[in-house]
Amino acid sequence: MKCPFCNASDTKVVDTRASEDDKIVRRRRECISCHKRFTTYERYDFNNLTVVKKDKNREAFDRDKVYRGMKKSCEKRPVPDSVLLEATKEIEVELTHSNKREVDSSEIGELIMKKLKKIDKVAYIRFASVYREFTDVKSFNEEISKLDNE
């Protein structure tokens, strides 16, 4: 681990703590050269999870892409970032617990819609309109009717 202050490659771990859910490890480090301290966070690596797109192309799972999709749907809505970050984490955990090496993008889209439906119905409709490729007002009305009937 390189020191962010002096770029020396020799550091030592001073303190290690796990998060409440044991998904992230926080480490306090000290540089041997300049003696400054800094914090690092280690998280489970999702690079072993591959997303299969509609066109059958494959790419590594990207949690930021999930977050950005939800964030875009919630623009100008009263939804705190902390809620979206928690939902992103829950989607990650659900995908991890499925023990699949590959997951269809449609499965991720459905998980996002499920979370957004609970968080904010307007954001849900926004996401659904893009994800399900609504082409007319009728599609919007049908989805809104489904929400009203729940």
From Swiss-Prot:
One of its GO terms (molecular function) is zinc ion binding. Keywords: ATP-binding, DNA-binding, Metal-binding, Nucleotide-binding, Repressor, Transcription, Transcription regulation, Zinc, Zinc-finger. One of its GO terms (biological process) is negative regulation of DNA-templated transcription. Residues 49-139 form the ATP-cone domain. InterPro entries: ATP-cone_dom, NrdR-like_N, RNR_NrdR-like. It comes from the Bacteria. A zinc finger (unnamed) spans 3-34. The keyword Repeat does not apply. Its cofactor is Zn(2+). The keyword Cytoplasm does not apply. Binds 1 zinc ion. Negatively regulates transcription of bacterial ribonucleotide reductase nrd genes and operons by binding to NrdR-boxes. Belongs to the NrdR family. This is Transcriptional repressor NrdR. It comes from Finegoldia magna (strain ATCC 29328 / DSM 20472 / WAL 2508) (Peptostreptococcus magnus).
